[in-house]
């Protein structure tokens, strides 16, 4: 009988570390809800002791999750474990994940301790975590370069202390599949209490072997795989969960295992992570890249037309990728748009129909026909703009040419006021940004500007993602329009609203602190 492989997602913890700008609590919750809809068994959503923002994110997600088990990371430090437990305690089911370096290199150069010290720290921390929950994971950081005798000793000790999952990370992506599979085999053969815990693997992609290493580990007996959506992560990234999941599905007969993932949510979740994290998916990315199911060779096209199985080992529909349709125009009613969203897997709670339909009509008037990818882009922006806006772009105009300096006029709604400014700049986008900055007077520095097309052809929606630095903090904004200058302006306004909200949070914190002091 096929055994289950537990899918452990760490997009919101290990994956987020690769981003230039941190995700907001709202954005993290969006991703967490998508992961739960996809059916991940465990999601690691943060490192609570690292910052108040991470603590709040973990607590918010823990409160919302109903089916997926929520996990938080902690070093083998008492405070880390206590704070993680506090952030998680509201969850219906949670896991504390403690980790400690075990390789000789890390122990001597980073921890500057002996292996016996590390062994004692691991046992103490696992026991402390067990005081809060019966689900404790222990990770042997840099296990791939840890002497096997030491690895076996610390795994046995951690299990005796109460660890229910033992994670074997290839922290720097150093091992080969043959070598990594051998490590898992050795653990099963040499650790006497290994049957009392689930063996997990967490592979990085520095040598491009994270997925292969993970699958080989599963063949050797590992029953949990850790990774991120789209392979997001530091350096070369983590193991791509969508690749592992589909490899297990396509080769289930050979591997003898399965997952509980809803495969038809893979594509949608991948797209959401890509947009929110401002990390485009390469066209040739396995499973979710735009070319993953494309056939350009004449021989291949002929073979696919005769039988898709000639050159496709899985279908686009198996990951939730629908065929593009051309059925929506400005004459389409609200019910037609709602029906199409339902066909694409969206629920009423995923978007506001009134504002989505208004945006749809404006786009349909410009484009004539609105495609599925247009609707998905509009729904994404719709979700980002649910919170009240202090700033709203009311109007802009630009004059530019090859021999004249670009000039922009902008009208911005600022709370209850409407303010206007004009400015010149090095091109139309810069001119608009200069005018907006004159209105708001926020000290910001543009760190990243990225333009991408949502859709195909000359009338594709232009999506602009920007990252700005404001007083040492980085904020992300996104704008969408058929006009690049307009989408650029909307992206900056989105950033300004995020900065404004952050200021309001700080003001409220200061007010509460002052009230508490007065009460004392």
UniProtKB/Swiss-Prot annotation:
The keyword Transport does not apply. Pathway: Amino-acid biosynthesis; L-leucine biosynthesis; L-leucine from 3-methyl-2-oxobutanoate: step 1/4. The keyword Glycoprotein does not apply. Residues 5-267 form the Pyruvate carboxyltransferase domain. Keywords: Amino-acid biosynthesis, Branched-chain amino acid biosynthesis, Cytoplasm, Leucine biosynthesis, Manganese, Metal-binding, Transferase. GO terms for biological process: L-leucine biosynthetic process. It is found in: Cytoplasm. Its EC number is 2.3.3.13. It catalyses: 3-methyl-2-oxobutanoate + acetyl-CoA + H2O = (2S)-2-isopropylmalate + CoA + H(+). SMART domains: LeuA_dimer. It is an enzyme of class 2 (transferase). Residues 392-520 are annotated as: Regulatory domain. It comes from the Bacteria. GO terms for cellular component: cytosol. GO terms for molecular function: 2-isopropylmalate synthase activity; acetyl-CoA C-acetyltransferase activity; manganese ion binding. Mn(2+) binds at residues 14, 202, 204, 238. Its cofactor is Mn(2+). InterPro entries: 2-IPM_HCS-like, 2-isopropylmalate_synth_dimer, AIPM/Hcit_synth_CS, Aldolase_TIM, LeuA/HCS_post-cat, LeuA_allosteric_dom_sf, LeuA_bact_synth, PYR_CT. NCBIfam families: leuA_bact, PRK00915.1-1, PRK00915.1-3. Belongs to the alpha-IPM synthase/homocitrate synthase family. LeuA type 1 subfamily. Catalyzes the condensation of the acetyl group of acetyl-CoA with 3-methyl-2-oxobutanoate (2-ketoisovalerate) to form 3-carboxy-3-hydroxy-4-methylpentanoate (2-isopropylmalate). Homodimer. This is 2-isopropylmalate synthase.
């Amino acid at each position: 009988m096929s055994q289950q492989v537990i899918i452990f997602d760490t997009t919101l913890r290990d994956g987020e570390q690769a981003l230039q700008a941190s995700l907001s609590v709202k954005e993290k919750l969006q991703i967490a809800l998508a992961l739960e809809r996809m059916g991940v068994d465990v999601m690691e959503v943060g490192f609570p002791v690292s910052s108040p923002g991470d603590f709040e994110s973990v607590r918010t997600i823990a409160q919302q999750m109903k089916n997926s088990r929520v996990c938080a990371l902690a070093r083998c430090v008492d405070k880390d474990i206590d704070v993680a437990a506090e952030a998680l305690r509201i969850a219906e089911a949670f896991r504390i994940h403690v980790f400690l370096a075990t390789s000789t290199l890390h122990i001597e150069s980073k921890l500057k301790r002996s292996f016996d010290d590390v062994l004692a720290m691991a046992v103490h921390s696992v026991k402390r975590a067990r005081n809060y929950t019966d689900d404790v994971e222990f990770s042997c950081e840099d296990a791939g370069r840890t002497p096997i005798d030491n690895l076996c000793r610390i795994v046995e000790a951690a299990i005796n202390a109460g660890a229910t999952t033992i994670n074997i990370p290839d922290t720097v992506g150093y091992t080969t599949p043959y070598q990594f599979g051998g490590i898992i085999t050795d653990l099963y053969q040499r650790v006497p209490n290994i049957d009392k815990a689930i063996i997990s693997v967490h592979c990085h992609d520095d040598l491009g072997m994270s997925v292969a290493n993970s699958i080989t580990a599963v063949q050797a007996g590992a029953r949990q795989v850790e990774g991120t959506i789209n392979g997001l992560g530091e350096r070369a990234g983590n193991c791509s969960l969508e690749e592992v999941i589909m490899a297990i599905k396509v080769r289930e007969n050979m591997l003898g295992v399965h997952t509980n993932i809803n495969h038809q949510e893979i594509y949608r979740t991948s797209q959401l992570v890509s947009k929110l994290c401002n990390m485009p998916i390469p066209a040739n990315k396995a499973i979710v890249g735009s070319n993953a199911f494309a056939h350009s060779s004449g021989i291949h096209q002929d073979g696919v037309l005769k039988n898709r199985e000639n050159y496709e080992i899985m279908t686009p529909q198996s990951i939730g990728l629908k065929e593009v349709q051309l059925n929506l125009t400005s004459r389409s009613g609200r019910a037609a748009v709602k029906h199409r969203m339902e066909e694409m897997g969206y629920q009423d709670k995923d978007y506001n129909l009134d504002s989505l339909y208004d945006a749809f009509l404006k786009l349909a008037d410009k484009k004539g026909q609105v495609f599925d990818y247009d609707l998905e882009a509009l729904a994404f922006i719709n979700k980002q703009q649910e919170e009240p806006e202090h700033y709203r772009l009311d109007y802009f105009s630009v004059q530019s040419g090859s021999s004249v300096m670009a000039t922009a006029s902008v009208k911005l709604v600022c709370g209850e006021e409407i303010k206007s400014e004009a400015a010149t700049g090095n091109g139309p986008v810069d001119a608009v940004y200069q005018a907006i900055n004159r209105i708001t007077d926020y000290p910001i520095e543009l760190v990243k500007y990225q333009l991408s097309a949502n859709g195909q052809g000359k009338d594709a929606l232009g999506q602009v993602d920007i990252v700005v630095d404001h007083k040492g903090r980085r904020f992300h904004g996104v704008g969408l329009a058929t006009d690049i200058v307009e989408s650029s302006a909307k992206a900056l306004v989105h950033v300004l609203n995020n900065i404004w909200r952050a200021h309001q949070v700080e003001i409220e914190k200061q007010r509460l602190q002052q009230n508490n002091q007065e009460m004392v």
